[in-house]
Amino acid sequence: MAGIVVRSESAVAVMGAGAWGTALAKVLIDAGGPEAGVVLWARRPDVAERINTTRCNRAYLPGTLLPPGIRATADPADALRGASTVLLGVPAQRMRANLERWGGLVADGATLVSLAKGIELGTLMRMSQVIVSVTGVDPAQVAVLSGPNLASEIAQCQPAATVIACSDLGRAVALQRMLSSGYFRPYTNSDVVGTEIGGVCKNVIALACGMAAGVGFGENTAATIITRGLAEIIRLGMALGAQVTTLAGLAGVGDLVATCTSPHSRNRSLGERLGRGEIMQSILHGMDGSDGGDGYVVEGVTSCASVLALASSYDVEMPLTDAVHRVCHKGLSVEKAMALLLGRSTKSE
């Protein structure tokens, strides 16, 4: 994609060296990069050290050689020093705790970009709301990046697009220019609510698609789940003030299709294992690093609870989300969940 490369004079901080944070650090450099470089914060010092010495993040994005211009650190003060743009790539349920620890390290006037897709348990806040609540920044300083963005594919420079949502168009355009490359195309949007809701809910629907595949159901079932899942997402989004066009775009349908159909999707993969009869706690034990591995988060497992609670507070019906929640947290079998969904009273589409 041809375009003008706009270089930022100050460094960009990417807080979170998981697969997505690492992939976006690479995108920033490939797009022309800030003159001061990209600083990638890793929670674990050994991960930061390996990135700096090998130019690879073997723990979370194996097989990808990171370009010069990315420097990793385990010191949040080091990462945030002088950064006018901060990409927040920590898990949704840890966003608040991390922001509280980082305290006054964020520069005044900095643009804060949420990469996390979740609703906070308890408060039922979206991530942009959590960021404003903890930091006290103007909501116009907060942007959300979301779309059909599987980190492993983007790290391989496969063509992809995303949405940058912010109420401040100037900030959105600045981020768009900063991230535009020959393989990564951002679109701007002012609908922060819709962009976030699409990103959160698609993880829950992807769990359902995985469950169906694990049981042995085919493409008709998958298409039904995706389509009816989209109906749930639109109902909740509209209740919260989202625009239907956002949910019909990259941050809605696009993200939903990618996550529900890709073998690289953590949420779909976990759902598939549940459909094959594996036990939730055993699966999570192998994913969270407690078995000695590097560990990663499957947001949909938590999101199904917070999304369901949020929907209930707005009197929005979400039967698929409810079924996923029952399987993940109430011990319902996938087969019984499917039977309950199919046994619901008939209605018009």
UniProtKB/Swiss-Prot annotation:
Keywords: Cytoplasm, Lipid biosynthesis, Lipid metabolism, NAD, NADP, Nucleotide-binding, Oxidoreductase, Phospholipid biosynthesis, Phospholipid metabolism. Belongs to the NAD-dependent glycerol-3-phosphate dehydrogenase family. Its EC number is 1.1.1.94. Catalyzes the reduction of the glycolytic intermediate dihydroxyacetone phosphate (DHAP) to sn-glycerol 3-phosphate (G3P), the key precursor for phospholipid synthesis. Sn-glycerol 3-phosphate binds at residues 117, 147, 202, 255, 265-267. Pathway: Membrane lipid metabolism; glycerophospholipid metabolism. One of its GO terms (molecular function) is NAD binding. It holds the Pfam family NAD_Gly3P_dh_N. It is found in: Cytoplasm. It is an enzyme of class 1 (oxidoreductase). GO terms for biological process: carbohydrate metabolic process; glycerol-3-phosphate biosynthetic process; glycerol-3-phosphate catabolic process; glycerophospholipid metabolic process; phospholipid biosynthetic process. The active site is at residue 202. Its main location: cytoplasm. NADPH binds at residues 20, 43-44, 117, 151, 266, 297, 299. This is Glycerol-3-phosphate dehydrogenase [NAD(P)+]. One of its GO terms (cellular component) is cytosol. The keyword Lipid metabolism applies. It catalyses: sn-glycerol 3-phosphate + NAD(+) = dihydroxyacetone phosphate + NADH + H(+); sn-glycerol 3-phosphate + NADP(+) = dihydroxyacetone phosphate + NADPH + H(+). InterPro entries: 6-PGluconate_DH-like_C_sf, 6PGD_dom2, G3P_DH_NAD-dep, G3P_DH_NAD-dep_C, G3P_DH_NAD-dep_N, NAD(P)-bd_dom_sf.
